[in-house]
């Protein structure tokens, strides 16, 4: 197993090879609470489950993908109470408050609007909601789930998945703020503020270069949420969305990617919105690969200074096809956020008992200097 330890002022190449910088832990008072020791907070993060209905049998499920996803759920249910290896700090895995899903829950939401595609999408979404549930009481998963949509859920059409998330948000445990569109939402756990921002962060205004994915005014929601839910800039904030952002951190201008996955102008506006807020970390999926980076709003090639930058974590696919799968176990304790990766590598038949192990660990301060 590989353990990634805190570093002191690493250069970029060293950072990308060995993990994120950690700082000394201090107890951070949460918004609306008096200063004091916070109760530990645990949660899981998964991504890219790609529940699949085959094209030749749209009312059924791909048995291989279904098996892997159900193994994933059973693993999530069984991890709490197990012992962490000493290289990961030892102790027991705590019971999570919930599971964050970084998008691409299903597979056929990008396949168009033919009757066949619609049938596949409906079969997949019905299976996802049946297995993953919502509050921890309805499905196979025993914990509440907090999902955002990815490009395989919907590209730009308000389909059954988008409408399903909107309906689920009204019943999702602990949610305190929902966007005007009904799609984006936020909540608080143990003094930490979480914001679910959909596929990308943007506003899709006509006067800006438009990425191909509809943002449903997620940028406006982010601004409003930070202004009204974190007004004193003391509460640690965790953001999550589907698409990775470092590739699209480029100068905003007429030549920005008009047909790319994410408008460079929207990415610029995203960073401008959050750079003076205490964002602890950003999580994304999409790439089906582990990514650990820092983001300071500058193009990737210029990213050499780590101070005042935001840690960004990209998750491996948790389901789907391929040979490598992973999930994050996150623990907030003593003023720090520790992210541990549990992964099943080089196994096409993923998550079989005994094939996964603890692979990586990062510790970052809960409150970043803004």
Label each PLM-derived region with a short phrase.
Residues 46-47, 99-103, 146-150, 239-241, ...:
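Active-site neighborhood of phospho(di)ester-bond hydrolases with catalytic His/Asp-centered motifs
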Residues 12, 35-67, 144-146, 175-265, ...:
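Metal-dependent phosphoester/phosphodiester hydrolase catalytic core
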Residues 343-370:
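Acidic, His/Gly-rich catalytic cores of divalent-metal-dependent hydrolytic chemistry
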């Amino acid at each position: 197993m590989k353990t990634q330890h805190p570093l002191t002022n690493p250069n970029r190449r060293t950072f990308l090879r060995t993990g994120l910088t950690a700082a000394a832990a201090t107890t951070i008072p949460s918004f609306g609470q008096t200063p004091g020791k916070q109760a530990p907070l645990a949660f899981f993060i998964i991504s890219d489950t790609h529940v699949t209905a085959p094209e030749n049998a749209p009312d059924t499920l791909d048995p291989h993908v279904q098996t892997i996803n159900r193994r994933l759920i059973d693993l999530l249910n069984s991890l709490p109470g197990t012992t962490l290896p000493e290289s990961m700090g030892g102790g027991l895995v705590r019971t999570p408050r919930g599971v964050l899903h970084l998008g691409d829950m299903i597979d056929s939401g990008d396949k168009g609007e033919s009757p066949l595609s619609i049938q596949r999408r409906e079969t997949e979404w019905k299976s996802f909601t049946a297995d993953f549930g919502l509050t921890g009481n309805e499905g196979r998963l025993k914990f509440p789930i907090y999902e955002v949509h990815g490009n395989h859920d919907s590209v730009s059409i308000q389909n059954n998945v988008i409408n399903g998330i909107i309906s689920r948000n009204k019943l999702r445990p602990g949610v305190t703020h929902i966007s005007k569109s009904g799609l984006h939402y936020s909540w608080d756990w143990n003094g930490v503020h979480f914001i679910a921002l959909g596929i990308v962060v943007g506003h899709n205004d006509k006067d800006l270069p438009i990425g191909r994915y509809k943002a449903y005014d997620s940028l406006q929601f982010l601004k409003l949420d930070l202004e009204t839910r974190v007004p004193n800039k003391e509460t640690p904030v965790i953001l999550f969305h589907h698409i990775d952002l470092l590739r699209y951190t480029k100068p905003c201008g007429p030549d920005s990617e008009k047909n790319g996955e994410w408008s460079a102008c929207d990415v610029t506006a995203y960073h401008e919105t959050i750079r003076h807020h205490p964002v602890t970390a950003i999580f994304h999926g999409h790439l089906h690969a582990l990514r650990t980076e820092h983001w300071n709003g500058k193009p990737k090639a210029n990213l050499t200074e780590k101070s005042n930058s935001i840690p960004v974590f990209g998750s491996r696919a948790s389901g789907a096809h391929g040979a490598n799968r992973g999930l994050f176990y996150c623990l907030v304790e003593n003023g720090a956020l520790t992210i541990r990766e549990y992964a099943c590598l080089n196994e096409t038949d993923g998550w079989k008992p005994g094939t996964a192990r603890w692979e990586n660990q990062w510790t970052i301060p809960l409150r970043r200097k803004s």
